[in-house]
Amino acid sequence: CEALVKDPKNQVYSLDNYFTGSRENHIEGVTYIEGSTEHIFELIDFAPDLIYHLGEYSRVEQSFEDIDKVLLFNKIGTLKVLEFCRKHHCKLVYAGSSTKFGDGGLGKDQSPYAWSKSSNTELIINYGNWYDLKYAIVYFYNVYGKGEISIGKYATLIALFTEQMKKGEPLTVVSPGTQERNFTHIDDIVSGLLIVGEKGNGDGYGIGSPETYTVLHIAQ
């Protein structure tokens, strides 16, 4: 929103149920609509040119105990967004999950979260074939930077480490710590999303760094 609203030609709206979002992150010039994607038809009475659908449930381990939220936000909500885009002829930019590429493609079914995201990308591609929906699917890799969640069970790794360091607490490293991860700063994600929103078409836009780091390396 912050990047989009800088262009005076853009009218920017944000639909957010604040499940993990915060009103403290609001940006001047953006119109905020409170509610969930499963109610998008009742909440939005106009036809946007472009929808960035970035607001699904997005945690792997936690999704096993939050499967009801995964199904509500990621399956029902995304179906409603797809139908909204089909009805109003909006282009959709969808945030897929890089988990589906893990273990040679076997990672797509290893958690409720991974399954929901992988199956959603298939559904979006089919909507493109069935209904001529304009879409682009992007994939993120461990995003960090301003606005991260730093406390609670939804905290991201770097934000959690930073918060623990500020408090002088030992860093929580899940054994063995040699797990390798790619990390991408939020500014790079935003730059990529703007390009994909303008020019992207179809599946397969990965936004990230080819460099990997172990969790222990990040902690050090």
Residue spans of the language-model regions?
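Substrate-binding strand-loop-helix patch
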Residues: 73, 147-155, 177-190, 204-220
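Hydrophobic alpha-helix immediately C-terminal to the catalytic Tyr-X-X-X-Lys motif of short-chain
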Residues: 119-127, 157, 161, 218
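Hydrophobic residues at beta-strand termini and immediately following loops
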Residues: 33, 138, 173-174, 207
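Ser/Thr-centric signal marking residues that sit
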Residues: 78, 97-99, 116, 172, ...
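Short hydrophobic segments within beta-strands
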Residues: 15, 95, 174, 207-208
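N-terminal Rossmann-like NAD(P)+-binding domain of SDR-like oxidoreductases, especially those catalyzing
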Residues: 1-143, 187, 193, 197
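Alpha-helical substrate-binding/gating segment
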Residues: 143, 159-172, 181-206, 212
